[in-house]
Design a protein with these regions (language model features):
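Catalytic alpha/beta core domains of metabolic enzymes, predominantly
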Residues: 112-118, 122-218
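Active-site beta->alpha loop and helix N-cap motifs at the rims of alpha/beta catalytic domains
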Residues: 2-130, 134-142, 146-147, 231-240
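C-terminal alpha-helical cap/extension of soluble enzyme domains
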Residues: 2, 7-11, 28-29, 35-37, ...
Length: 242
């Protein structure tokens, strides 16, 4: 698997009748795949995954997996069927932690995850989140996930999570308000929940970013949220407009 440096949530482009706009999604995926960005999160919150159906999520994942190398994709898992869909497509799952009452429930979920799975931890979805204490227990028990997008955490939390998980865990801080500090604290790189990265890959842009914006794998900071790429998506409707 590629060790991702920049994770970008992508949109789900829909027709006015509520069906997947397969032509727009396909063109969007092809354009995204031609950029320098490392990893694309399919059917996440920005992609409307929470409110879409398993059938829609499956079809969108199929479209992306046919056009972008699978090791550059993460399939957001909102329901059990999504996990099977990700396996069918050969895409790494990122499992949303939902409605976990306590640490024991969390550990039960972690114990059942595929070895390459990521987790998506957000207090909006579960009262028990992926904390440093949970992470340390999971690591000692041999059930630590491969990585995770961990939301609503402080810089101290990022440092503690990095210490608890070790260097092999791909840690993504779900906030984008303190990018450099988060990377120094141990995060791999940022995910932007405000929609900015969607503009980076919605694109009328050259495939190669300027040298100073590329992710080389050696940079202390490689995320960019201000490339000169014209958006072609109406974010309110998730439909192509140009």
């Amino acid at each position: 698997m590629t060790v991702a440096r920049v994770m970008v949530p992508v949109l789900t482009l829909m027709n006015a009748n509520g069906s997947v706009d397969e032509g727009a999604c396909s063109a969007y995926a092809e354009r995204a795949g031609a950029t320098w960005l490392d990893l694309f999160l399919v059917s996440g919150t920005i992609g409307g995954g929470e409110s879409s159906t398993p059938t829609v999520r499956r079809r969108v994942l199929e479209l992306w997996a046919a056009r972008v190398p699978k090791d550059r994709l993460l399939a957001c898992v909102w329901a059990p069927d999504d996990l099977a869909h990700a396996a069918d497509c050969g895409v790494r799952p990122i499992v949303v932690l939902r409605d976990l009452a306590d640490a024991a429930a969390m550990h039960s979920v972690l114990a059942e995850l595929p070895a390459d799975a990521f987790v998506y931890s957000h207090p909006n979805y579960t009262p028990t989140t992926f904390t440093p204490a949970v992470a340390e227990t999971a690591r000692r028990a041999g059930m630590q996930p491969a990585g995770g997008k961990i939301c609503k955490v402080s810089l101290d939390d990022v440092r503690d999570l990095r210490a608890a998980t070790g260097d092999g865990f791909q840690l993504y801080d779900g906030r984008c308000r303190h990018v450099a500090e988060s990377v120094r604290a141990g995060a791999a790189l940022m995910c932007d929940e405000r929609g900015v990265p969607c503009h980076l890959v919605c694109a009328q842009a050259e495939a190669d970013a300027p040298t100073e914006h590329r992710s080389t794998g050696d940079d202390g900071l490689a995320v960019v949220v201000d490339l000169p790429i014209a958006p072609v998506i109406d974010l309110s409707t998730r439909r192509r407009i140009a």
